[in-house]
Swiss-Prot record:
It is found in: Cell membrane. This is Activin receptor type-1B. It is a single-pass type I membrane protein. Autophosphorylated. Phosphorylated by activin receptor type-2 (ACVR2A or ACVR2B) in response to activin-binding at serine and threonine residues in the GS domain. Phosphorylation of ACVR1B by activin receptor type-2 regulates association with SMAD7. Residues 177-206 form the GS domain. It catalyses: L-threonyl-[receptor-protein] + ATP = O-phospho-L-threonyl-[receptor-protein] + ADP + H(+); L-seryl-[receptor-protein] + ATP = O-phospho-L-seryl-[receptor-protein] + ADP + H(+). Keywords: ATP-binding, Cell membrane, Glycoprotein, Kinase, Magnesium, Manganese, Membrane, Metal-binding, Nucleotide-binding, Phosphoprotein, Receptor, Serine/threonine-protein kinase, Signal, Transferase, Transmembrane, Transmembrane helix, Ubl conjugation. Belongs to the protein kinase superfamily. TKL Ser/Thr protein kinase family. TGFB receptor subfamily. Residues 1-23 form the signal peptide. The gene is Acvr1b. Transmembrane serine/threonine kinase activin type-1 receptor forming an activin receptor complex with activin receptor type-2 (ACVR2A or ACVR2B). Transduces the activin signal from the cell surface to the cytoplasm and is thus regulating a many physiological and pathological processes including neuronal differentiation and neuronal survival, hair follicle development and cycling, FSH production by the pituitary gland, wound healing, extracellular matrix production, immunosuppression and carcinogenesis. Residues 150-505 are cytoplasmic. The chain crosses the membrane at residues 127-149.
Length: 505
């Protein structure tokens, strides 16, 4: 009621304040001088027999400061004059009785600082919807997650049950069969294309991973244990599924197995209930890649010949087409380099990483090129690949590109040959001509435009083995792919050299 009364009396007061109630007249003995905001003619000063007043209020969003005089007759009721009262929400007023005592500044009423309250726009139906909607959505998400997890667990357990119930799997993998027995079975199998798929799956799911031994753009390589023997497990990231599928497919090509090609054991997409791992299991070679081996060790002339001859033998077998019922298509590697060749315990090479390989069907004369986003290693690309003049419809073009890369690998091996106490530090091909990670444009400029090749030192001429290696390299590096040596020709030349040097292979 007090606030309503204050509000109803506010506007007459505003009129009074804005108009100014003070006047200027002859000053009496007891007259009081006050500041007056509306007394322009008397220098903003008024005189009264009552009180000085200062007030601040907000009118239509505009802040007003009023100072004036209140006559004594208007100071009613006595003791608590109406004009001197403040209202918390409307105005702040102060009366005083000393000359110019109203020259003080008052605070704006707190009510004017508050935002006006808006009536609620939500009815009961809307409020129920706002509360129930998120609850229902959360409940739905929980159900979906539960169903997905339950589905994966059922699939996983069903696969385990099927593997356990498969009698042929039990016959093939008896408890006393070791890794050596399995490798022997693979080597002597009639098809030469690897184990049956259900056996591969069983082997892959009983491997225990031991340690990570390498990383690449495809994923990781682990050393694993299976029945007392070491195996290499290449684990592909999920985005590299095409590479995994392609490499597994190439490794299981009929009649592919060869002592100088990495021994394939199994491939499996392991579903552990929440995500899928893509595994490719192969023989384990503790020396690692040829790149790692040459970085750590120098080689003798005998060691150089063994590495070079075994690499040529593996590549010749890849390139070879075997005609017949159990025939083998010709295969080109397309990413041959020292990091994709492994060194076995006996000092021989095994060609690995067939994810980019292509197969040639001699009957239809077609080339099986898988849709894969990967490209070969730029440093090892042949001139015709760099300048994009390679004939993609002619299988021999891919074989010639492999030979060019093999010549670069031979250069890496020969540099580390310790002859008469002389050897050179390990370096990648073109190390002195391009940066560590060259672009295709940088390689094209060096290889195609400037026609440069790795340097063959003159002192190699003093040793027959190095002289032959240097001559072969140059014949592998011809700009014209058709003029390069074949893998079979290289193999025969190195076989003759091994006899001359009395190298026991």
């Amino acid at each position: 009621m007090a606030e309503s009364a204050g509000a109803s009396s506010f506007f007459p007061l505003v009129v009074l304040l804005l108009a100014g109630s003070g006047g200027s007249g002859p000053r009496g003995i007891q007259a009081l001088l006050c500041a007056c905001t509306s007394c322009l003619q008397t220098n903003y000063t008024c005189e009264t027999d009552g009180a000085c007043m200062v007030s601040i209020f907000n009118l239509d969003g505009v802040e007003h400061h009023v100072r004036t005089c209140i006559p004594k007759v208007e100071l009613v009721p006595a003791g608590k004059p109406f004009y001197c009262l403040s209202s918390e929400d409307l105005r702040n007023t102060h009366c005083c009785y000393i000359d110019f005592c109203n020259k003080i500044d008052l605070r704006v009423p707190s009510g004017h600082l508050k935002e006006p309250a808006h009536p609620s726009m939500w009815g009961p139906v809307e409020l129920v919807g706002i509360i129930a909607g998120p609850v229902f959505l959360l409940f739905l998400i929980i159900i979906i997650v539960f169903l997905v997890i339950n589905y994966h667990q059922r699939v996983y357990h069903n696969r385990q049950r099927l593997d356990m119930e498969d009698p042929s799997c039990e016959m093939c993998l008896s408890k006393d069969k070791t890794l050596q027995d399995l490798v022997y079975d693979l080597s002597t199998s009639g098809s030469g294309s690897g184990l049956p798929l259900f056996v591969q799956r069983t082997v892959a799911r009983t491997i225990v991973l031991q340690e990570i031994i390498g990383k690449g753009r495809f994923g990781e390589v682990w050393r694993g244990r299976w029945r007392g023997g070491d195996v290499a497990v290449k684990i592909f990231s999920s985005r590299e599924e095409r590479s995994w599928f392609r490499e597994a497919e190439i490794y299981q090509t009929v009649m592919l197995r060869h002592e100088n090609i990495l021994g394939f054991i199994a491939a499996d997409n392991k579903d552990n209930g929440t995500w899928t791992q893509l595994w490719l299991v192969s023989d384990y070679h503790e020396h690692g890649s040829l790149f790692d081996y040459l970085n750590r060790y120098t080689v003798t002339i005998e060691g150089m010949i063994k590495l070079a001859l075994s690499a040529a033998s593996g590549l010749a077998h890849l390139h070879m087409e075997i005609v017949g019922t159990q025939g083998k298509p010709g295969i080109a590697h397309r990413d041959l380099k020292s990091k994709n060749i492994l060194v076995k315990k006996n000092g021989m090479c095994a060609i690995a990483d067939l994810g980019l390989a292509v197969r040639h069907d001699a009957v239809t004369d077609t080339i099986d090129i898988a849709p894969n986003q990967r490209v070969g290693t730029k440093r090892y690309m042949a001139p015709e690949v760099l300048d994009e003049t390679i004939n993609m419809k002619h299988f021999d073009s891919f074989k010639c590109a492999d030979i060019y890369a093999l010549g670069l690998v031979y250069w890496e091996i020969a540099r580390r040959c310790n002859s008469g106490g002389v050897h050179e530090d390990y370096q990648l091909p073109y190390y002195d001509l391009v940066p560590s990670d060259p672009s295709i444009e940088e390689m094209r400029k060096v290889v195609c435009d400037q026609k440069l090749r790795p340097n063959v030192p003159n002192w190699w001429q003093s040793y027959e083995a190095l002289r032959v290696m240097g001559k072969m390299m140059r014949e592998c590096w011809y700009a014209n792919g058709a003029a390069r040596l074949t893998a079979l020709r290289i193999k025969k030349t190195l076989s003759q050299l091994s006899v001359q040097e009395d190298v026991k292979i």
